[in-house]
């Protein structure tokens, strides 16, 4: 299977990964060690909905790997992969959110937030901590606490910032059937 990317998709990955890194440097601490409220997942969710699951996956993988490299504590692959999977899962359901058609009403907001909340619960509450236990032999109690807090924090930040970004984006799109011939 050969995957070909358009120039627009390559640019989306590059800009998305760069935004992931820059926004990811803003850390709002939580009471759980090594866990903070992260705002970059709202941008990743936006790009996943607009460009699809592969772009969302790449934005998360590349952006998180670069961010981890820059902050100096090394690459934490289980969480890097979880970031990519978040974008993948959200992007898989893009056809249910109509922002590309210029529509993002209460139904779309509800669907988007159900998708992102489930994706956050899956990747941060299950996959990342499970990977930490299996691969890094981390204490299960510690990493599941981190994962649950990260999942809740990311879910709330994407619900707020991601919804606002998608509302703004939908407003820039022409609604289907809105143009009429005079």
UniProtKB/Swiss-Prot annotation:
Pfam families: ECF-ribofla_trS (PF07155)
Compartmental location: Cell membrane
Membrane topology annotation: Multi-pass membrane protein
Transmembrane segments annotated in the record for this chain: 10-30, 46-66, 73-93, 109-129, 148-168
A cellular component term, taken from the record's GO annotations: plasma membrane
InterPro entries, sorted: ECF_substrate-spec-like, UPF0397
Keyword Chaperone part of the UniProt annotation: no
Protein name listed in UniProt: UPF0397 protein SPD_0432
Organism, as annotated: Streptococcus pneumoniae serotype 2 (strain D39 / NCTC 7466)
């Amino acid at each position: 299977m050969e995957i070909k990317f358009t120039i627009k998709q390559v640019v989306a990955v590059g800009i998305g990964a760069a935004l992931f890194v820059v926004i990811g440097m803003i850390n709002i601490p939580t009471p759980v060690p090594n866990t903070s409220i992260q705002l970059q997942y709202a941008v990743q969710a936006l790009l996943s909905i607009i460009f699809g699951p592969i772009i969302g996956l790449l934005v998360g993988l590349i952006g998180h790997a670069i961010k981890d490299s820059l902050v100096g504590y090394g690459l934490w692959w289980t969480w890097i992969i979880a970031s990519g999977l978040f974008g993948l899962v959200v992007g898989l359901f893009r056809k249910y959110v109509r922002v590309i058609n210029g529509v993002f009403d209460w139904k779309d907001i509800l669907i988007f937030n159900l998708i992102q909340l489930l994706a956050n619960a899956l990747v941060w509450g299950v996959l990342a901590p499970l990977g930490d236990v299996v691969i890094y032999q981390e204490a299960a109690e510690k990493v599941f606490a981190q994962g649950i807090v990260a999942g809740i924090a990311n879910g709330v930040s994407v619900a707020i910032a991601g919804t606002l970004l998608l509302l703004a984006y939908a407003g820039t799109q022409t609604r289907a059937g809105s143009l009429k011939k005079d």
